[in-house]
Structure formats: structure tokens, C-alpha cells
Amino acid sequence: MPPVPETLEDTGLSPEALVDLVLKTLYVQGARTGQQLTDTIRIPFALIDDRLLDLQQRQFVEVRGAKGHGRGGYTFDLTGKGRERAREAMDSNQYVGPAPVPLTKYREWVERQSIKGVSVSREGIEVGFSHLVLDPKFLDQLGPAINSAKSMFLYGDSGNGKTNLAESIARMMGGDLFVPHAVDVDGHVMVLFDPVHHRLLPEGRVNGSKSEEDWLEPVHAYDRRFARVQRPVVFTGGELTLDQLDLQYDSHSKVYQAPFQVKANGGVLIIDDFGRQRVRPRDLLNRWIVPLEKRMDYLTLHTGHKFPVPFDSLLIFATNLDPLDLVDEAFLRRIHYKIFVPSPTKEEYQKIFRRVCVSRQIVYRNEAVDWIYEHFYGRLGIPPRSCHPRDVVDHLCDYARFVDSEPVLVDHLLQGACASYFLDMPDGGGEVGAGVVAADANADEPAESGLDDPLATALSRAPSESEPESTASAVGGPAESTEP
């Protein structure tokens, strides 16, 4: 845990930086007690009180009242002179909140909590993915990719659970870590904590007696400028643009927002629908060549100053496009693990269908799957997808309610369900004929099987490049790692 700072030097803040933060807090929030200032700034009151005493002597702050014993219960407010000084501080930046953590300390704690320290065993991955129908050989590919803490490419036709797999990987890794609310970069504030991506866990406390001075202040076991959160999972899709990979500067508040790859440090970063972004895949990978190899990214302040930040996440690309149509082999080698997510076999399809029926309290019959294969997959040339069982059963339940019937797997209900789901295109196949919708992240049974992988054949025939061999290949079978 990040230790509680005992001195101002321990915080990494200069005396004037803390003074400015106290003044801005009083300016924005109005009169506050010492305890309320501590709750906002998140450093021990004793350190804040040293600055309050100085501000009182300089006639910037005055005491308006008291609640309880000790200065922690005093109510502090700005004087007229103090408001002028606070406005000067606001001109620098308008950040009010937990005191920023120095960039060096942030780097230190990213390294201490690195995703490289997370590993999964065969038994652990079987338990973690027990809610999915997966070929055991597929787990042999997935496990090493997770343990690498590098980059992973999940590709295959839509509807086979790539997005679900990526999110399941993140959930399976579990754990928690400490993320600073904000980081100080040469006097500039970069806000890092994001409630969208960082799920707070309860704050810990240390048992023990309290002195009269800090009786109002809860005793915490760690530096409260850090938030204790679940391992972050940052998800982005087709809306991604190149400028989102850089610092987002608000010219009004003069505060920076960290880009999403920084918010993902210590966790999982998922780029869904890779190749469908408004930015070209080549441009995106060009932007990340150095971070992928060096595990370090470089961001730029609006002043032009560049600074390094850790790039420490398991990066997962997911796409239903042909990888060789997106980027050339040289770029694919930069992504360490390439894992093909194929359509389910009929046996896997039956297992998925059975699980969906159980979850909907419907009696399962193998004959129902045989009927769908004969009347739709076979007749229309539509390839089965892992999301189909869930969607077909949902349609069947909807149709049963419409005709005032119990949802059972009988021909006329299956016909009504499938007719409104699959596109009746005799020359079908492909994405349109499949009638596929996006796999729900909480769906019970997306699945994969060990079918042939087209990229494996294409890569095996590709001419050798000047770059070193890909550190790992996980296509069409168990991973063959050549990682040193």
C-alpha cells in the first residue's frame, strides 16, 4: 500500500503547491472545517494545518467558528485578501480535489503493481472460463497469451464471442490496485482516476487510539491520494480516434485528462472492432509501436514538453475482419499472440443451446438443433455462430408470448423464431446471411472450437521479414511460443 505521508516532503508537493490547493478549495467550496479540507485534499490534517497557520499569519485565511475540539474542527474561510490570492491560483489551473501525486511516484506504483506480476494456471483458466463452451486446445493458446501481459489479437467471424472472451479475461485476472486521483507533471495536473473505468473498493482503516487533535479524522492505512480499485478494464471500439491517445487539455480549467491507455495501466485494454475505427489500423499501430515494445508511452503537454508514462496493460485487439486486410505481416509480428476464434462445431453448438435453455427454464431437445441445422444452416448455407442459440431462444420466447403458448422447442415455434432472425437468402452465408448480432458481454455461452485458421496458412506462406520472428504464434492450434 502507498504509505501515508508523514511530512510535506513525503507528499512530493512544494509548500506553495499545497497552499494554492488549500486556497482554491476554500474559493470553490466556501468555508470548510479542517476535517472537510482533509477529506477533499486527502493528506493528513497535520500537514494541511501547517499551511493554514501560515495563511492565517499572512491574513489570507481566518477562523469563522469551531465544531468540537482541536483545529480539525475549526471552520476556515478566505479573507478579502485571500480571495484575491485564490483567484491568482485559479488562473494557474482550476483543479480542486485530492492532492496530485508526483509523476515519479506514479511510475513507481505502476511498476510495483505491474500486470506482468499476474499469472494464470491451467486449472485457474479452466475455472475462469467455465461459464463458456471452449475447446481445451483453445485454452492452451489463451493461457500463455494472458501470462505474457503483452498484446493479443482475437480474430474470426462476428458472433463467436471475441468481445465476451476479452471481457472474461479481464474478469478472470481479478485483483485490485492503487490508482492516484491525479498526477503532477512539472506543475501541471493530469487527472487519472475515472469512475467509468476504475471501480472503487472500500477504504481500509487502521485500528488504534486517536489523539485529541485528530479525533475527527479517520485513520487510513494508505495514502488517500490513491484510490483502491478493482483491476481496470478499459474498453473502446469504433469511436476511437488518434487524438484520444493523447492528453486531453481543457483550456478553461487548464487541467489535463489522462488518455484511456494510461487509465488502463495495471489492467486490460480492449480495442474492439479493430479496423472499423475512424483511424486507419496502420496509423493506430504506428502510434503504439514504441509503447508495445518498450512498455513506455510519451505524452505531450500543450507547452510542447514531452514526458514518459508507463504502458502497462494487457492489450487485446478484437476484429471480425481478415487481419491481412488490415495490416501487413510486419505489423502483425508486433502483436505477440494471434488467436483465431472459429465458429462452433455442432457438438459445441448443442452444448451452448442446452445451457441457454437451462437458463431460460426450457426443456432442451437435441432434435431442435437438428431441425435448425436442416432447415436453416443447411438450406440457406448460413454458418452457425456461437451467439445464435441465445438469440434463437430469445426469439422463440418472444414468439411464444405472441401466440399465447409455453416456450417449448417444437417445430412451429422454432420456425417462427428462426424466420425472423435468419435472413432467407439462398445464396447467403457471410455476415448478412448469418443474421448475427453482437455477442452480449453477459451472454451465457459464447464458444469457440478448433477449426482451421486461414491466417495461420497465410502467415506460413508469407516471405520472411527483416524483423525478428514473432515472439509467439497461437493460430489454429496450441500456442508455439518462441519467446526468450
Locate each region found by the language model.
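Short acidic, hydrophobic short linear motifs in intrinsically disordered regions
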Residues: 28-40
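Short amphipathic alpha-helical interaction segments
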Residues: 42-57
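Interdomain "pre-motor" coupling segment immediately N-terminal to P-loop NTPase/helicase cores
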Residues: 53-118
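Dynamic helix-loop-helix/coil hinge segments at AAA+ ATPase domain boundaries and subdomain interfaces
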Residues: 111-139, 362, 379-380
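Conserved ASCE/P-loop NTPase catalytic core
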Residues: 130-317
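A short helix-turn-beta junction within AAA+ P-loop NTPase domains corresponding to the substrate/partner-engaging
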Residues: 327-342
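Conserved AAA+ ATPase small/helical "lid" subdomain
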Residues: 353-415
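C-terminal engagement/docking regions of AAA+ P-loop ATPases
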Residues: 410-484
